[in-house]
């Protein structure tokens, strides 16, 4: 779980747009965040397997 201070800090609008970075909406993780869903890879996988993300299915080949 991410530190509360860093999560709150990321919610503020920065002075410069380039300082902005994406965080997971669920857990606040700063790395491996999918822009389209706003989720990190771990939360994305959990929600996709539960069927909470429409149009996403597990690949098999």
UniProtKB/Swiss-Prot annotation:
Organism in which the protein naturally occurs: Petrotoga mobilis (strain DSM 10674 / SJ95)
Q: Taxonomically, which superkingdom?
A: Bacteria
Kindly state the subunit structure of this protein.
Part of the 30S ribosomal subunit. Contacts proteins S3 and S10.
Q: Which GO terms describe its cellular component?
A: cytoplasm; small ribosomal subunit
- Tell me which family the UniProt entry assigns to this protein: Belongs to the universal ribosomal protein uS14 family. Zinc-binding uS14 subfamily.
Q: So what does this one do?
A: Binds 16S rRNA, required for the assembly of 30S particles and may also be responsible for determining the conformation of the 16S rRNA at the A site.
What protein am I looking at? Answer: Small ribosomal subunit protein uS14
Query: GO molecular function terms here?
Result: rRNA binding; structural constituent of ribosome; zinc ion binding
Per UniProt, which keywords does this protein have?
Metal-binding, Ribonucleoprotein, Ribosomal protein, RNA-binding, rRNA-binding, Zinc
What this protein needs as a cofactor is: Zn(2+)
User: Could you give a single Gene Ontology term from the biological process aspect?
Assistant: translation
The entry's Zn(2+)-binding residues are 24, 27, 40, 43
Co-factor binding details? Binds 1 zinc ion per subunit.
Pfam families reported for this sequence: Ribosomal_S14
Which InterPro entries does the entry mention? Ribosomal_uS14, Ribosomal_uS14_bact, Ribosomal_uS14_CS, Ribosomal_uS14_sf
């Amino acid at each position: 779980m991410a530190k509360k201070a860093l999560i709150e800090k990321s919610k503020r609008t920065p002075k410069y747009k380039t300082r902005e970075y994406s965080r997971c909406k669920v857990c606040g993780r700063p790395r491996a965040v999918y822009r389209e869903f706003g989720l990190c890879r771990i939360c994305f996988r959990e929600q996709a397997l539960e069927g909470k993300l429409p149009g996403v299915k597990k690949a098999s080949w």
